[in-house]
A protein has these predicted regions:
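Short, flexible active-site loops
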Residues: 144-150
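Asp-based phosphoryl-transfer active-site loop
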Residues: 3-19, 94
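A structure-centric signal for secondary-structure junctions around beta-strands
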Residues: 3-4, 67, 102, 148
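Acidic, His- and aromatic-enriched active-site or binding-groove loops in soluble protein domains
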Residues: 122-144
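Active-site phosphate-binding/coordination module
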Residues: 24-127
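Short, small/polar residue-rich loop motifs at catalytic or cofactor-binding pockets
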Residues: 1-3, 59
Length: 150
């Protein structure tokens, strides 16, 4: 059997179903991995504060990979262990490149997510209903995304 030391689990639509529930089978598998000494790490586009309590309350879950992979957070302390921010100029270039496509744009800055009003409106029409309360509570709407990045 391979020596597995870490399991990183996507949350939305994978560990959690569209109703934000974890199946009994998935919980059992996570607990079995933790009991074997495997580090189980939630991996998510969310910021650390948006990881559902059901996952955080599992003894042995110590870290989270957040902000679409740009940050690793120690859950007990909230301390950032790894931060991989974009260079400011590159962030501006990426924003300018994706804005014309009209998708949902969220920019993470110091653990918070920011988006413009048009992006916030698109979230309302595209987000799974069970996820909307989290998205509404965790996103900050700003009138000017380039200025937000400056």
């Amino acid at each position: 059997m391979p020596d597995i030391r870490l399991i990183a689990l996507d949350l939305d639509g994978t560990v959690f179903d569209d109703e934000k529930r974890i199946s009994a089978r998935t919980l059992q598998a996570i607990r079995a991995a933790l009991d074997r000494g495997v580090d189980v790490v939630p991996a998510t586009g969310r910021q650390a504060g948006g990881i559902p309590a059901e996952f955080l309350q599992m003894p042995g879950v110590r870290y989270a990979l957040t902000a679409n992979g740009a940050s690793v957070v120690e859950l007990a302390s909230g301390r950032s262990v790894v931060r991989l921010p974009f260079d400011d100029a590159l962030a501006q270039q990426v924003l300018a490149a994706v804005q014309p496509f009209g998708g949902v744009i969220g920019v993470f800055i110091d653990g918070a997510c920011y988006g413009d009003p048009a992006s916030a409106a698109r979230v309302e029409s595209t987000c799974p209903p069970a996820l909307l309360p989290y998205v509404r509570a965790s996103r900050h709407v700003v009138p000017d995304m380039p200025a937000c990045l400056a």
